[in-house]
Design a protein with these regions (language model features):
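Conserved lysine of the Walker
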Residues: 26
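Switch II (G3) loop of P-loop NTPases
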Residues: 82-87, 106-122
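Conserved catalytic-core segment of NTP-binding enzymes
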Residues: 117-228
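Hydrophobic positions on the alpha1 helix immediately C-terminal to the Walker A/P-loop
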Residues: 29, 33
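Phosphate-binding P-loop
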Residues: 6-13
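N-terminal phosphate/diphosphate-binding loop that engages ATP/GTP or pyrophosphate donors
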Residues: 36-90, 97
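The conserved Walker
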Residues: 22
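Hydrophobic anchor at the beta1->P-loop junction of P-loop NTPases
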Residues: 18
């Protein structure tokens, strides 16, 4: 997968956790970021880092990162999630490897966190393992999801997540979309809300999520300078959605 809107020097903190309500797209973003970083690191001859993706989305067992386990392994991403009979469990199960990975200096850890305050408590249980000074806690925002349509409602959800996890948000990810029906207006309105939410929380907009079709349109018509406003954007290919919902297979050639 080409990433035309992501600078070549784009990188992640030692630990990056993505939080937000169900349907915001955090699992897709977590998976894509992990694969992207693994690919970029593997291209460096002096690289000593590895990438791990921790799936602690313990609530709704839909579109979770663990569903792409075999493909992630082939792409050099270490998946940390319950396996075997517990793979589909809708239970607050955290693997011991998560705590170990959080302490490893040679590991970039990406965390896919549950979609509401109850799920954020799972992240809170790792608080003593993670260097909070090197943790990015990013709120993924899709304006078209319930309770995400106004600054006040988003900030209320954000405050609940912060209290539940015992951690402070460090940024916002704008990922407003309508799947295949996403328009340029959706991207613009989503970014506008994300900026206002960021202002209310005193954190920056760190990233924009774009579906493949809308990203192609933006690149073709050279709309990035005006639409994305200098904010890095990551192209998402719906690797976690089943084919009947427009998903695609994750392969070692992507992203």
């Amino acid at each position: 997968m080409q990433q035309p809107f992501l600078p070549a020097d784009f990188t992640l903190a030692s630990s990056t956790a993505l939080v937000g309500p169900y349907g915001s797209g955090k699992s897709e973003i977590a998976l894509t970021l992990a694969c992207l970083m693994a690919r970029r690191l593997q291209a460096r001859p002096d690289n000593r880092l590895q990438v791990a993706l921790g799936d602690i989305d313990v609530l709704k067992p839909y579109f979770r990162a663990r569903e792409a386990g075999e493909a992630l392994k082939a792409m050099g991403v270490r998946l940390l999630a319950p396996g075997g009979s517990l793979k589909s469990a809708d239970l607050p199960i955290l693997t011991p490897e998560l705590g170990c990975a959080a302490r490893e200096a040679d590991t970039l850890l990406v965390l896919d966190v549950g979609g509401d305050p109850a799920g954020a408590r799972a992240l809170g249980s790792l608080r003593d393992e993670v260097d909070t000074n090197a943790l990015d806690l990013l709120l993924v925002l899709n304006r078209h999801r319930p309770f995400m349509e106004s600054v006040e409602s988003v900030v209320e959800q954000a405050d609940k997540i912060q209290r539940a996890s015992g951690l402070r948000l460090t940024g916002v990810v704008s990922n407003t979309h309508m799947m295949a029906e996403t328009t340029l207006d959706d991207v613009a309105l989503g970014l506008e809300l994300a900026r206002r939410v960021g202002g209310a929380l005193d954190v920056p907009v760190r990233l924009i999520g774009l579906g493949r079709a809308i990203a192609t349109l933006i690149e073709r018509d050279d709309l990035a300078p005006s639409l994305l406003q200098g904010i890095p954007a990551i192209v998402l290919d719906s690797a976690l959605k089943p084919a009947f919902l427009g998903g695609c297979a994750l392969s070692p050639g992507a992203p």
